[in-house]
Amino acid sequence: MRNQEEFVLTEGRSWCISSWLPSWCPTSLSHLIKSEDRILKPIKVKFTQGYVPISNGNYIWTLGFNEVECSSDLSITGVQQLKVPLVLLHGFGGGVGLWVKNLSAFAGEGRPVYALDMLGFGRSSRPTFGRDAKDAEEQFVQSLEDWRKAEGLEHMILLGHDLGGYVSTAYALKYPHRLKHLVLVEPWGFAARPNVQERWIPIWIKAFGAAMNPFNPLGPLRLAGPLGPLLLQLLRSDFKQKYASVFADDTVADYIYHVNAQTASGETAFKNMTIPYGWPQHPMMDQVEKISPSLPMTFIYGSRSSIEGQSGKAIQEMRPNSQTKIIVIQGAGHYVFADQSEDFNQAVLKICNNEC
């Protein structure tokens, strides 16, 4: 892992609308760094942070826990067994900072834990993605495999939330032998768009969707310019409540703003992977049967989430001779890991400990 200062000149300034209007959005790389430092401050265990170089001159921003001296278990034969690393992939519009309520718990038992800003998000490289959905998907997958090689991990427990769940599944399809367990938290992109969808969507929503189609999903946040931070606080005031046990101010909203007001990259890839209105071009339900039957899978849903949980049940039925579990966290919404962090942490630790 490289020093965090090494790529500052490579990243340059993040311009949110165009190179001739850099000051429209009140953000920059330094703002993002400061907001990330603030959101990670409550973590009391030691960790490293830095850029991991991958192919095509890109890099992945990574937090690492227990990398050098990880705890080990002694089996009844006296052979030392290292714990399998846990790797976390955030969802759309997220970043490493949103795991602040989970990282200390995950790393507390000595297990190597890594949290990544996915390619195109957070402090990772923001390259141009392919316009084809499959090309964009492959770029995400290859960046993860490049990162794994750079970190020297033979195997890992891969946990993905939302878009991170989709990318994790795509990775499992291509590199199943690298995974000990696939954990999908409220994963996006599994179900196909229902045929009845068009019938019940109001005309005004269809018109608005058509008008916004040329723009990236987070374009309005940038177009709002100096009002962007306030707009985010108003529209997503729920995040303050989700993290109220950790922060009394707008630390989380500030972090989310600076993560998403940077140059569009990962969100462009996401847009290229979708069809109206946010449904996947290539639903994972059509591909999941190809996943190795020997790979254990666990789906984690929130009981109050708007994400449909039928995909997990359907996949469980598809894999009658494979280990496929479904966990529902009571009282949690889409951001399960923030809404009910203690229950979520316990569930994930149990999965990890079963894999060593």
Predicted segment positions?
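Flexible "cap/lid" subdomain of the alpha/beta-hydrolase fold that forms the substrate-access gate
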Residues: 2-45, 82-83, 134-142, 149-159, ...
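Active-site loop/oxyanion-hole signature of alpha/beta-hydrolase fold enzymes
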Residues: 53-58, 65-80, 108, 114, ...
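Active-site glycine-rich loops that stabilize anionic/oxyanionic intermediates
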Residues: 83, 91-95, 162
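Serine-hydrolase catalytic-loop signature spanning alpha/beta hydrolases and amidase-signature enzymes
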Residues: 91-101, 113
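Catalytic histidine-centered segment of alpha/beta-hydrolase-like enzymes
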Residues: 332-346
